[in-house]
């Protein structure tokens, strides 16, 4: 594939396609991944980053499955912090791998919900509050992998390079 500029993409999902193009070309170029095309909606740009992060994090969770299980990680911890899973009627303790799956399923469902995100061309202001909770929970999955499965995390990051751009995006936003 040849590289194309944002202006060349003629699609209602141009931001998604452009972000995927940037990631495909050079995931390590964090500055370029974070640079929103001129004249675009910042909320939609953040939304597309979260959507792409959820897709990419599925690869991390699959990579963790062999080492992170109910026996090795009976609770969702990052260092010594214990996190409860919000996927249940009442937040409760889950093993780390279940927490990761629940978190990704919940984030993906929420980001694809027509109730909260009826359009990918603009984000309704009442839905912006979900960005922070999604980001916080996804960060916990990264943190668990970093503190408890460093080798798998490092392997994932070397091939997919998602954590560092995402942290830069969150601290830049």
What is the role of each PLM region?
Residues 1-122:
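Extended alpha-helical interaction segments
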Residues 112-173:
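Alpha-helical bundle/repeat cores within regulatory domains of eukaryotic proteins
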């Amino acid at each position: 594939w040849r590289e194309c500029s944002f202006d060349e993409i003629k699609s209602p999902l141009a931001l998604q396609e452009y972000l995927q193009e940037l990631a495909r070309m050079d995931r390590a170029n964090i500055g370029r991944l974070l640079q929103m095309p001129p004249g675009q909606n910042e909320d939609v740009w953040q939304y597309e980053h979260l959507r792409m992060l959820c897709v990419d994090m599925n690869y991390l969770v699959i990579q963790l499955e062999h080492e992170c299980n109910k026996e090795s990680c009976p609770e969702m911890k990052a260092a010594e912090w214990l996190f409860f899973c919000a996927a249940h009627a009442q937040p409760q303790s889950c093993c780390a791998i279940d927490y990761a799956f629940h978190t990704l399923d919940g984030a993906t469902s929420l980001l694809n919900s027509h109730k909260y995100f009826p359009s990918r061309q603009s984000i309704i202001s009442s839905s912006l509050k979900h960005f922070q909770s999604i980001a916080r929970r996804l960060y916990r999955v990264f943190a668990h992998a970093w503190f408890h499965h460093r080798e798998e995390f490092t392997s994932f990051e070397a091939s997919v390079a998602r954590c560092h751009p995402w942290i830069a995006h969150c601290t830049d936003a």
